[in-house]
């Protein structure tokens, strides 16, 4: 199994050096949930791996209550920075991630990495200490900065006008970094992260600028904001812990505990990420440096239960750790004593009755003291090593099985970091399939972490945000709200669908004012969307604010960008007035005003007819005929006028009180059909037909028509020829405009 695991590891290693972590790999909500926890919470809400070290992944339990507690605290410690973004694959100079890659080895050597919990609540350590004077001067320093140069103003204006111009941001950030301008850097980076918080490389650049100017406290705050935004970023955790080790205050003797707490926050935040190997390796290396071998074993016990890219290498290193050290050093005292008793019982002669009655512990030294007999001591050590490896082998075997189920999905992730460029379809499909697999087979914790990883790479695709929010609905209302807020305010400010879903969610929760503000915000961001305006109208209508609903529609009519848009809203307003407010007169007035401004729009006439039909048709006969005449005398297209002409004949046939009016309508309809036929012949033959031939054809058509009308048999007034009544059922609505083409069948064209 190990060999197979190593071969798979090699495959991924060929794609990404070291642990396979992508240069810009970031973390999102899963860790955001963690970021809201306080240090005291960590002991009760550690990932299942850390709680049940000896159990395989499938047995790990992540209770719904724990998930709820985590997600409910997501936003408690939110810092001014918005959710994190990832580095983009812009030109080399624009890719902060690439520059940071070259610095990663130093970070790994100097400090273990950790993706931790939310920076604001991380009671990891007192922020790295600098002399009090520089820290105190940090705030007053800003106003003392020289005025911003003209070039800065020019570059800043570009991104202010178009925040989605990522290259513009890159040029601005490069400029302030090259000019070493502290005030400009602060303004530029703070503005940049409001739009692209997932670019972890730029968080490090920002922190480095603060550090170079001597503002260690500010640099620490920048790191914490970055980890608040992207807690799944292994790389950012590595840089941060390196920063802590270089700048920590060792005078109080708590430096070691602070670093250890940082690592714990880190592995809690992103330790279950498939590509978190370097974080675990750094943690292990640091504990080894401290000489805490029992802690190293405890870390391995957690790691060997987690499906990661380098799972096989971890097990091999664990065996080396066991073989290279004395069990009493790398095991906790409790496990050491328990294992010693277990081995003593196993080696006790089975036929010795006296031995059975004698407690085995009485033959053994107390605690972790060595056996007096050197030979027995060596044997005991070897047996203990064998037993320790044997128990972890079972964990490894199960973990390898879990890795094998996910390997194809992980290998299919070619861009695990954020970028403004669109993802390939194969990448999107891989994420969809991976999420579906984890939803069906994984624990809630693993599902959350995978969603968070997905949202880094797919931050600009609303389908994944929506899917994540739907998943969290069964766990926590606050978690759902957090996801929608992050999607709509940071990553997808101009995607209406996710905003509409967020507003609907808030309305379901009874937060009507919040729903209103969401819809207003998206309408400001993307003006002119009918779906948003109609959702605002329906929101007000559902809650009895009819005046506001009417005002919204009236405003849309008045401020329509063209007559067609105004007509659309006029129809909506008329329907509301009729169906909801029971005001037929006002509805008719709205439609008539719309007809005056847009007389070629057939939908207005159809809705006006529907309005007239809704009453007593016998009493409204004159108004209905007037409506038909208004449509027929308009400058609508001929095909539309034929449709209204046919409907006028239908109406008079069904409800008319005057045969003369009916016959006049029929004759008018025949003239329109003849006009249409003439246009068809011209389209087919052009204007090259001799006038004599064209006249003969027209005469024959007229004669044939007259003969049909004059025949004394049923065909002279036959519904099958003149009015195909069955084709017009009561199920048809006046508003079904797409059926215009069907009305030509009512009147077959004159024979030619």
UniProtKB/Swiss-Prot annotation:
Name of the protein this chain belongs to: Pre-mRNA-processing factor 39
Gene Ontology biological-process annotations: mRNA 5'-splice site recognition
Species classification: Eukaryota, Metazoa, Chordata, Craniata, Vertebrata
Ranges of compositional bias, category Acidic residues: 352-361
Main subcellular location: nucleus
Single GO cellular component term: commitment complex
Subcellular location: Nucleus
Span list, region Disordered: 1-148, 347-374, 678-703
Gene3D superfamilies: Tetratricopeptide repeat domain
Low complexity bias locations: 43-56, 76-94, 133-148
Start-end of each HAT repeat: 180-212, 214-246, 254-289, 408-440, 442-474, 700-731
Record key words, sorted: mRNA processing, mRNA splicing, Nucleus, Repeat
Polar residues bias (residue ranges): 28-42
Function: Involved in pre-mRNA splicing.
Phosphoprotein as UniProt keyword: no
Keyword Repeat in annotation: yes
Organism superkingdom: Eukaryota
